[in-house]
Structure formats: structure tokens, C-alpha cells
């Protein structure tokens, strides 16, 4: 089903070869709580990063909607972590195909370590419990600015990570590789128009990042996909 697109915006941003100068930008920090509107009013949860001296450049960048890649250092206790050990009685955890692939790869590495290093299952579980987390990559779309619809007086960086999560991740480390600009901020006549535009922004991000010049190599290759050419090593190092 096609999404509303009253302004006839394109689904693809930038050339197929990849981001153009001055992109990509980098940003990192711990996820903080925001205005509390993303999930409650919009149904679009956001993970906010502080606009501080560590990310001073963001104070002067044009306000608007950007897109790119996010990496989250989810602890082993988080249900969406590739290191997560699901309790026998727990409910199924929602995972998108990328998360499933990353978890399968980690499980294969764990099994290989057990076979090669002689690590028993009890000891392996202990090692996983002590793990502080592992960087996992997701596409993202983000707003930088004041959000005219809500008349914010404080400049913010609100990130919508394009994935399904079974729990929040406040306090988790997040890194962003911002690859392009989608559109300017604008005011809306009503909440529905704002939500429709955000959903279309997400589709723009998904389509644009699916091209090999925009896809980070560190994601690996799934069946039917081309290997990415964009250097995303900073996201996971």
C-alpha cells in the first residue's frame, strides 16, 4: 500500500554512488529521555541524543530531517541484543530480519568458540552475562531542530531507529552515521499530516539506504542483497 505523498517527494535521496560532501556526519552519546511524545502521540518512538559540547557541530547545522545509520550497544540483558539468552518461559521476542541475522551470526561465533576453545556451556553463559554489549546497526531517520508543530524552544536531536524493539534502551550507547538530508522542518495543520510525513520520511530512508553505495559493509550480505560499499566501521569499533 502506498503512503500519502501530497508534496510528491522523491523516494530516493542522493546519487546511487553514496553520500556527497559534507556528509557523512558523526554523532554519539548515551540515549536520553525526550519530550515523551514519540510513542504516546505519534506511535513513532524516538531515541534522543544530547546536543552538547561533544556534538557541538549540530548547533549550527540546518534544522530538518536527516537519515543514515545508527548503532546501539545493547547489553546482553536486552531482549533485542544478539547476546541475549532467552529464558525458557519468556514470550517470543520481536526481531526484524537484520536482528535475526546478527543474532544467528553471534550464536555461530559462540558455538565455534566453545568447540575451539573448550569453553563449557556454563562458562559461556557467564561470559555472555559479563558482556557489556555489542554494537548492532540499524537504519534510522532523525529530526534536528525545534519541531515547529510543537513549538519547541530547545534544539533537539530525535532519532527514530527503524527496527522492532521489545524494550526501551535509555542509557545505551548510540552512534550515528548521518548520510543525507531529507527535508526542512515545517509546521502542520494537524497531527495526522505530521505523522504521514514522518512515515514517508522512513520510506525515503529505507529506499535510499538499500542501495549498495549507501549500505554499510558491516551489515553483511543477505540473500538477494548486494554487499554494501559504505564504510561503517566507526559504528561498531
Curated annotation (Swiss-Prot):
One of its GO terms (molecular function) is ATP binding. The active site is at residue 158. The keyword Acyltransferase does not apply. Mg(2+) binds at residues 46, 48. Its EC number is 2.7.1.26. Belongs to the flavokinase family. This is Riboflavin kinase. It comes from Neurospora crassa (strain ATCC 24698 / 74-OR23-1A / CBS 708.71 / DSM 1257 / FGSC 987). The gene is fmn1.
Amino acid at each position: 500500500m502506498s503512503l500519502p505523498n501530497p508534496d510528491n517527494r522523491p523516494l530516493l535521496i542522493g546519487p546511487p554512488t553514496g553520500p556527497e560532501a559534507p556528509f557523512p556526519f558523526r554523532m554519539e552519546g548515551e540515549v536520553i529521555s525526550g519530550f515523551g511524545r514519540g510513542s504516546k502521540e505519534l506511535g513513532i518512538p524516538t531515541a534522543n541524543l544530547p546536543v552538547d559540547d561533544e556534538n557541538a557541530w549540530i548547533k549550527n547545522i540546518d534544522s530538518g530531517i536527516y537519515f543514515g545509520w545508527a548503532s546501539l550497544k545493547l547489553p546482553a540483558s536486552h531482549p533485542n541484543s544478539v547476546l541475549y539468552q532467552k529464558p525458557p518461559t519468556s514470550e517470543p521476542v520481536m526481531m526484524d530480519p537484520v536482528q535475526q541475522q546478527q543474532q544467528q551470526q553471534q550464536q555461530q561465533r559462540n558455538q565455534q568458540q566453545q568447540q575451539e576453545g573448550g569453553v563449557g556451556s556454563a562458562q559461556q553463559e557467564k561470559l555472555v552475562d559479563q558482556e557489556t554489549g555489542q554494537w548492532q546497526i540499524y537504519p534510522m531517520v532523525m529530526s534536528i531542530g525545534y519541531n515547529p508543530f510543537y513549538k519547541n524552544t530547545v534544539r533537539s536531536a530525535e532519532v527514530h531507529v527503524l527496527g522492532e524493539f521489545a524494550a526501551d534502551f535509555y542509557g545505551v550507547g548510540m552512534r550515528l552515521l548521518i548520510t543525507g538530508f531529507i527535508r526542512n522542518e515545517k509546521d502542520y495543520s494537524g497531527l495526522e499530516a505530521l505523522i504521514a510525513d514522518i512515515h514517508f520520511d522512513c520510506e525515503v530512508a529505507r529506499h535510499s539506504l538499500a542501495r549498495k553505495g549507501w549500505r554499510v559493509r558491516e551489515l553483511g550480505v543477505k540473500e538477494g542483497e548486494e554487499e554494501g560499499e559504505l564504510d561503517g566501521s566507526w559504528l561498531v569499533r
